[in-house]
Amino acid sequence: MKIHEYQGKELLKQFGVTVPRGIPAFSVDEAVAAAEKLGGPVWVVKAQIHAGGRGKGGGVKLGRSIDEVRQLSSEILGMQLVTHQTGPQGQKVRRLLIEEGADIKKEYYVGIVTDRGTQRVCVMASSEGGMDIEEVAAHSPEKILKVFVDPAAGLTDAEAAELARGIGVPEASVGKAAAEFQKLYKAYWDTDASLAEINPLILTGSGDIIALDAKFNFDSNALFRHPEIVAYRDLDEEDPAEIEASKFDLAYIQLDGNIGCLVNGAGLAMATMDTIKLFGGEPANFLDVGGGATAEKVTEAFKIMLKNKSVKAILVNIFGGIMRCDVIAEGVITACKAVNLNVPLVVRMKGTNEELGKKMLAESGLPIISADTMAEAATKVVAAVK
């Protein structure tokens, strides 16, 4: 689960991280009132969407008067903000953060993720904070320092100070920077986050260290422990199809292709998408029905896939382990009739009750294309859309 920047800063503040004064706004009038309450002479008007690259996309602007704040707020609020993370369709801006300006002497980056290779939390920091951090990661990875944290000890004073010195924080401010790193680590750990990031973390002219941005992702499997985090959820920022899918315990992510995929198991789903691409097609979605799929779940999965008007064919790829192929076959038949399926459907089933499932499909009277291998299934579904 993702949250907005202003919510991330509220969270950081609870853990003692230094953040600028700021007020969220949902209208132009609220933005102006926020600027007046904060006082000048400079304000930052920031679009609030669940995507990075807002500055480059025109979603972060400086206002040097109340009138300019009003003008910028009216331009940004309601705009379709396009960044490298939103895709070409962009994301509508429904909220703003009005923030006091900062005296920026130097920008740094600090982020925390779980490293699966070492099975430890990785704290990353760089002297090259700001809008181009992704280019730094791609082209100058040596500029990103990493510390792999012992979970029993946490991020120690020595590790935090070494990281601060390593990215060039002036010695007089190393203690402050190290403390901010440790507070960010505690926020990450205590909230079951999967990502915690400050970009930029700035050094001011007076030597203070301030978090000018905040980005958090949370492990959805741990949200039952954090109702205060769940309260931050903004459904307007989520794909309606993904929200609908979650109601039926379906893992669904919409993509840009035209071949719908219905698969059981995340690994098989990814392999199926790879195979489609290998044979010249483009998957329209990731959809994992899981090991306990019912006819109802399969029907809902078809409905969700077909709401995407880009879908020109569907591939069902099932391995019957816990899931029985006859149950999937029943669901496919029910779904085809319920949605009046009018796009080509290719079905591959292997495993438990495979022959029974194939027999049910063959006797259904529906124009279902069968396949025995993944390569055959991918070949047939790609041919169906050409």
UniProtKB/Swiss-Prot annotation:
SUPFAM superfamilies attached to this UniProt entry: Glutathione synthetase ATP-binding domain-like (SSF56059), Succinyl-CoA synthetase domains (SSF52210)
Enzyme class: ligase
EC number: 6.2.1.5
InterPro entries: ATP-grasp, ATP-grasp_succ-CoA_synth-type, ATP_grasp_subdomain_1, Succ-CoA_synthase_bsu_CS, SUCC_ACL_C, Succ_CoA_ligase-like_bsu, Succinyl-CoA_synth-like
Keywords: ATP-binding, Ligase, Magnesium, Metal-binding, Nucleotide-binding, Tricarboxylic acid cycle
UniProt-annotated binding residues for ATP: K46, G53, R54, G55, E99, A102, E107
Positions that bind substrate: N264, G321, I322, M323
Pathway: Carbohydrate metabolism; tricarboxylic acid cycle; succinate from succinyl-CoA (ligase route): step 1/1
Matching Gene3D superfamilies: ATP-grasp fold, A domain, ATP-grasp fold, B domain, Succinyl-CoA synthetase domains
Gene Ontology biological process terms in this record: succinyl-CoA metabolic process; tricarboxylic acid cycle
Domain of life: Bacteria
Positions contributing to Mg(2+) binding: N199, D213
Mitochondrion recorded as keyword: no
Recorded catalytic activity of this chain's protein: succinate + ATP + CoA = succinyl-CoA + ADP + phosphate; GTP + succinate + CoA = succinyl-CoA + GDP + phosphate
GO CC terms: cytosol; succinate-CoA ligase complex
Cofactor section: Mg(2+)
Entry-linked PROSITE patterns: ATP_GRASP, SUCCINYL_COA_LIG_3
Single GO molecular function: ATP binding
Domain ATP-grasp stretches: 9-244
Keyword Nucleotide-binding set for record: yes
Assembly behavior: Heterotetramer of two alpha and two beta subunits.
Role, per record: Succinyl-CoA synthetase functions in the citric acid cycle (TCA), coupling the hydrolysis of succinyl-CoA to the synthesis of either ATP or GTP and thus represents the only step of substrate-level phosphorylation in the TCA. The beta subunit provides nucleotide specificity of the enzyme and binds the substrate succinate, while the binding sites for coenzyme A and phosphate are found in the alpha subunit.
Family per similarity comment: Belongs to the succinate/malate CoA ligase beta subunit family.
Protein name: Succinate--CoA ligase [ADP-forming] subunit beta
UniProt organism field: Bordetella pertussis (strain Tohama I / ATCC BAA-589 / NCTC 13251)
Gene designation per UniProt: sucC
